[in-house]
């Protein structure tokens, strides 16, 4: 099948018209993938020539092309959340931190998958990757529930402290009332009481 061209210039002589060769969507995706991998992993020693050498391996490129949209979507979410974290209201900050942690974990895992696919005999189908992402979602959901429980415990503790502080004046007032009551005699009888008791016993005899 021949290449397709698009005419750029509609003016002038037909022989002077300019054309550009049209690329298929697959070619554009491959170019985008090559650029992305080169920018992301060249610091680790994976260069563009190494990436291009994989283009002949259909399965490898298919795996990488399947990973790229998910990576870009997660990276975009991570960037937006990171930007919003400093200015978000306090009541949503905890939830945002959990989502940010989830995105970071997914990106780290996909970095490993990209690297292993580039330098090793490793491939992952989209279904398996979705299962992996679902696993992270479950783990982070559990973490979120644990954080909620911890928050409830902290709130309960703060409420208990507040109640104790509010009750403190009342307890002091009741203590003052108790101190105003007559003391209960707990000491040994005095000599006068003893003599009265002896006289009473003598009369009875």
Swiss-Prot record:
Give compartment(s): Virion tegument; Host cytoplasm; Host Golgi apparatus
**Record PTM:** Phosphorylated.
Pfam families (UniProt xref)? Herpes_U44
Q: Which GO terms describe its cellular component?
A: host cell Golgi apparatus; viral tegument
Covalently lipidated residues (S-palmitoyl cysteine) read 4
**Main localisation:** virion
Task: Tell me which UniProt keywords the record has, alphabetically.
Answer: Host cytoplasm, Host Golgi apparatus, Lipoprotein, Palmitate, Phosphoprotein, Virion, Virion tegument
The record describes the protein's role as: Plays several roles during the time course of infection, including egress of virus particles from the perinuclear space and secondary envelopment of cytoplasmic capsids that bud into specific trans-Golgi network (TGN)-derived membranes.
Whom does it interact with, and what assembly results? Oligomerizes. Interacts with U75; this interaction mediates U75 incorporation to virions.
Q: Which family does it belong to?
A: Belongs to the herpesviridae UL51 family.
The protein, known as: Tegument protein UL51 homolog
What organism is this sequence from? Human herpesvirus 6A (strain Uganda-1102)
Query: What gene name is given for the protein in this entry?
Result: U44
């Amino acid at each position: 099948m021949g290449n397709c061209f698009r005419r750029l210039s509609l003016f002038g002589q037909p022989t002077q018209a300019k054309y550009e060769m049209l690329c298929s969507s697959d070619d554009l995706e491959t170019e985008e993938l090559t650029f992305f991998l080169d920018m992301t992993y060249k610091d680790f020693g994976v260069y563009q020539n190494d990436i291009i050498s994989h283009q002949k391996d259909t399965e490898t490129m298919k795996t990488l092309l399947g990973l790229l949209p998910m990576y870009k979507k997660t990276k975009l979410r991570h960037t937006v959340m990171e930007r919003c974290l400093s200015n978000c209201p306090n009541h949503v900050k905890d939830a945002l931190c959990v989502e940010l942690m989830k995105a970071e974990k997914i990106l780290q895992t996909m970095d490993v998958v990209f690297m292993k696919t580039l330098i090793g005999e490793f491939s992952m189908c989209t279904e398996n990757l979705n299962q992996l992402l679902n696993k992270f979602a479950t783990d982070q959901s559990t973490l979120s529930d644990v954080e909620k429980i911890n928050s409830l415990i902290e709130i309960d503790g703060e409420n208990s402290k507040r109640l104790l502080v509010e009750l403190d004046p009342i307890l002091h007032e009741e203590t003052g009332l108790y101190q105003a009551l007559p003391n209960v005699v707990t000491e040994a009888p005095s000599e006068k009481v003893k003599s009265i008791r002896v006289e009473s016993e003598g009369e009875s005899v």
